[in-house]
Amino acid sequence: MTHPEREAGGMMTTSYLSFPPSTTVKETLEKFRQEAANVDLVYYVYVTDDEERLLGVVTLRDLILADQDKKLEELMDERVISVKLDDKEDTIAEHFAKYAVTAIPVVDENERMQGTIMFKNLLEVVAPHLGQ
């Protein structure tokens, strides 16, 4: 399904890293190294259940500094800011401004991960329309 360019679904990339909550830091970093070339810029790893429902987020900084044997469920922040597939650019821009994040996960109506929007993706869509 294609989404309009000025909605979250049209701005998102489907290139992101997600892991089950029981994954260790060591396992996450190993997978990150394997997948790094295939993934856009990574600021966060997303913690999802077996149906890809978004449970939490771990910053790359927290991941690097954590004990290798810790599980993501011990590190994750459950207060995840997300947008829906059909959210418009103004809502997305407000989220970036209000929460000072570098990427926002995009979820469907069942809270399942669909992709992420990086701030640069928002700018690419909004910049051509500034001053109109």
Which positions does each model-derived feature cover?
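Cytosolic regulatory modules rich in charged/polar residues
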Residues: 1-132
